Amino acid sequence: MKATAKAHPIQGLVKYHGMRDTERRMPYHDSISVCTAPSHTQTTVEFRPDADEDVYVIGGEEVEGRGAERIQAVVDRVRELAGFDHRVRLESENSFPSNIGFGSSASGFAAAAMALAEAADLDMTRPEVSTIARRGSASAARAVTGAFSHLYSGMNDTDCRSERIETDLEDDLRIVAAHVPAYKETEQAHAEAADSHMFQARMAHIHAQIDDMRDALYDGDFDAAFELAEHDSLSLAATTMTGPAGWVYWQPRTIAVFNAVRKLRNEEDVPVYFSTDTGASVYINTTEEHVDRVEEAVADCGVETDVWGVGGPAEVLDESEALF
């Protein structure tokens, strides 16, 4: 009853903000994202009928408190579906920095859900597994189905699931990841989202924005898709900044990257757009032809960069790749 899985983190394109059901982590509205590769999380799980307690280890450190509670929500859902109460050992490692706005919770819970479902011998499609991953992080649902994916808010626990969107943009997209370290508190931001006076304004346009993003992806329209993502980042930030806690995640270098991107676009006609989730780090979306110029301009802002492509769905790995 042991399995190992890998999943890629996500960049939110039309991001969800706030949850109407916090226990099952069901968001107020639909969302669309793209997975980033080769960044990934790898997770090994083993159900142990004779063990007395669950053990969760991330990056070599045992997880306790709220982090353990979120993992247990995913584990408990798998146990419920499998019809047993075996204890589990879970170990996970990231190939990229966590908690700076690069979607590590998405890849983490997606890999966990995929490995747990396999170890429990559940015969499930990826959209079905996405409903399990969602118990840890709604973004993880989209990391299960991979590439460009759409999480439907749905009417219930079953149809609040992710499905992949086919698009010609997958091969040419290059993502320059600008690392701007700064602590973030995404869970609290979600908890108070509806208390922002900007939240209803966001809800008023988000459904049309989802439709526009799907159309742009279906049409393979790079500029339309990533201009929408850039605008959505600003809308999300406005809602977060005007919540009760007044969260401001951006740092001076975040703004410097924004300005560098707009300068490339306006003065050099480079197809390039920025995007942020809840964090100070920045995704810069461009094409293979222009990625070197974009990376050079972003590096001039004094930030570390990586270049990523589009990542596929979560997958079960061979037993030889187990972490324990």
Curated annotation (Swiss-Prot):
Signal peptide: none
GO biological process: isoprenoid biosynthetic process
InterPro entries: GHMP_kinase_C_sf, Mev_decarb, MvaD-like, MVD-like_N, Mvd1_C, Ribosomal_Su5_D2-typ_SF, Ribsml_uS5_D2-typ_fold_subgr
Protein name in UniProt: Phosphomevalonate decarboxylase
UniProt superkingdom: Archaea
Regulation of its function: Is strongly inhibited by 6-fluoromevalonate monophosphate but shows negligible inhibition by 6-fluoromevalonate diphosphate (a potent inhibitor of the classical mevalonate pathway).
pH dependence comment: Optimum pH is about 7.5.
Keywords carried by this UniProt record: ATP-binding, Isoprene biosynthesis, Lipid biosynthesis, Lipid metabolism, Lyase, Nucleotide-binding
A Pfam short name: MDD_C
Catalytic reaction(s) noted: (R)-5-phosphomevalonate + ATP = isopentenyl phosphate + ADP + phosphate + CO2
Gene3D superfamilies for the chain: 3.30.230.10, GHMP kinase, C-terminal domain
Cited function: Catalyzes the decarboxylation of mevalonate 5-phosphate (MVAP) to isopentenyl phosphate (IP). Functions in an alternate mevalonate (MVA) pathway leading to isopentenyl diphosphate (IPP), a key precursor for the biosynthesis of isoprenoid compounds such as archaeal membrane lipids.
Protein family per UniProt: Belongs to the phosphomevalonate decarboxylase family.
The protein's Enzyme Commission number: 4.1.1.99
A GO molecular-function descriptor: ATP binding
